[in-house]
Amino acid sequence: MDALSLVNSTVAKFNEVTQLQASPAILSTALTAIAGIIVLLVITSKRRSSLKLPPGKLGLPFIGETLEFVKALRSDTLRQFVEEREGKFGRVFKTSLLGKPTVILCGPAGNRLVLSNEEKLLHVSWSAQIARILGLNSVAVKRGDDHRVLRVALAGFLGSAGLQLYIGKMSALIRNHINEKWKGKDEVNVLSLVRDLVMDNSAILFFNIYDKERKQQLHEILKIILASHFGIPLNIPGFLYRKALKGSLKRKKILSALLEKRKDELRSRLASSNQDLLSVLLSFRDERGKPLSDEAVLDNCFAMLDASYDTTTSQMTLILKMLSSNPECFEKVVQEQLEIASNKKEGEEITMKDIKAMKYTWQVLQESLRMLSPVFGTLRKTMNDINHDGYTIPKGWQVVWTTYSTHQKDIYFKQPDKFMPSRFEEEDGHLDAYTFVPFGGGRRTCPGWEYAKVEILLFLHHFVKAFSGYTPTDPHERICGYPVPLVPVKGFPIKLIARS
């Protein structure tokens, strides 16, 4: 509603009030309030009209282009969604997503603006409903110094030094999983099995949960919670969000009992401070000697469980799908991994030294992340008006950076639609800054990226040791990105060829 329409509406309402013979005091108060609103709207309207907003379209009221965005998620056409608008409006364009005016920034400059200006120009933006599901004390939601402290705490488990302690255990878990659930099978569904694998790893490495029934409980709860992220956030019967809230409460009940038990075990020295993620977070002290609250420990255990489950399972599945279409790349992975295996003694597990030797396999993983990154990008909210590329992005608007605007552009990656791991064979630094951003960047770089890297490389190592090859039952299986990160719609069923 513009200022003139509001004035006309206000006059009509005022006439109704005066006809009801309201008291002079009430009329005076009402007129003052209405006048103030009108003045404020006129000023805001004039200010907004004086700004050079990015080109684009906001779509239908409230809905905006959310339906088109979700449709693109479902059909794996997010790249086209971005490129069509970029081609029409330029590297900076406006739209409306989830009921809010949004600016999408394309190219390295846009990525740099968002990823290098956390808490300077922009801050993380979650709806209250989603924040409640993620955990109000989680590293994904917290800002400023609270966020910094949580990252330091998580690094004790997820960083390189922490991973040194757990890599052997993770390697054994993955080897045993493949021996038990893959070997001896003619055909398997990759997505289904890697979900089981990642869930098992997380339950054991994060919480020391070995009980199958308890792991299955967490698994079922997690599937409901992740499915709710793009649902309508209404807490009423029949909606996924309500089921997710109930699931969160059930999950909290399960893990709260574990937390109390672990605190007792740590006090009595029946558990070590680095036994798993739960122990690491309970034992953490910041620079002032202050521990994390129980709520922060639980919320961040939840957050790591959620993050490791969906993005890692997506990439494990997609990397096998891409290698199936590029057999020469698969053979190079096989050669590298079998050479590493040949240098191990019977029963000796993979070490961080071995991970560093997986240079080509790491290139394959990076190329898979470039071509099919599980994450489209992330949202931020502007803290003040921002001037960028000749346009003003108003305070309070959403801003989105996206992997699609650089990962699949010929100007940054030659032949972007071709699977070429060799493009990453040079040492770090050969890529232009902010062109390859699968894990985000800046203060909010994915805290678990090294953990995910190690888990995926270990999976590939044990997979090629067990199988000399595989063939997809549907080589042209479609990719879908809704409601979870990109995955093949059928889960990528494959026929296995056992290594003799």
From Swiss-Prot:
Entry-linked PROSITE patterns: CYTOCHROME_P450
Enzyme Commission number, as recorded: 1.14.14.182
Location in the cell: Microsome membrane
InterPro entries tied to this protein: Cyt_P450, Cyt_P450_CS, Cyt_P450_E_grp-I, Cyt_P450_sf
A biological-process GO annotation: paclitaxel biosynthetic process
Regions that span the bilayer: 24-44
Catalyzed reaction equations: taxusin + reduced [NADPH--hemoprotein reductase] + O2 = 7beta-hydroxytaxusin + oxidized [NADPH--hemoprotein reductase] + H2O + H(+); 2alpha-hydroxytaxusin + reduced [NADPH--hemoprotein reductase] + O2 = 2alpha,7beta-dihydroxytaxusin + oxidized [NADPH--hemoprotein reductase] + H2O + H(+); 7beta-hydroxytaxusin + reduced [NADPH--hemoprotein reductase] + O2 = 2alpha,7beta-dihydroxytaxusin + oxidized [NADPH--hemoprotein reductase] + H2O + H(+)
Chief place of localization: membrane
Annotated CDD domains: CYP90-like
Keywords from the UniProt entry: Endoplasmic reticulum, Heme, Iron, Membrane, Metal-binding, Microsome, Monooxygenase, Oxidoreductase, Taxol biosynthesis, Transmembrane, Transmembrane helix
Presence of the UniProt keyword Transmembrane helix in the record: yes
pH dependence (UniProt free text): Optimum pH is 7.5.
Domain of life: Eukaryota
Residue sites binding heme per the record: 446
Pathway assigned in UniProt: Alkaloid biosynthesis; taxol biosynthesis
One Pfam family per UniProt: p450
Topology in membrane: Single-pass membrane protein
Entry's Gene Ontology molecular function annotations: heme binding; iron ion binding; taxoid 2alpha-hydroxylase activity; taxoid 7beta-hydroxylase activity
Family named by the database record: Belongs to the cytochrome P450 family.
Biological role stated in the UniProt entry: Catalyzes the conversion of taxusin to 7-beta-hydroxytaxusin in taxol biosynthesis. Catalyzes the conversion of 2-alpha-hydroxytaxusin to 2-alpha-7-beta-hydroxytaxusin in taxol biosynthesis.
Protein name in UniProt: Taxoid 7-beta-hydroxylase
UniProt organism field: Taxus cuspidata (Japanese yew)
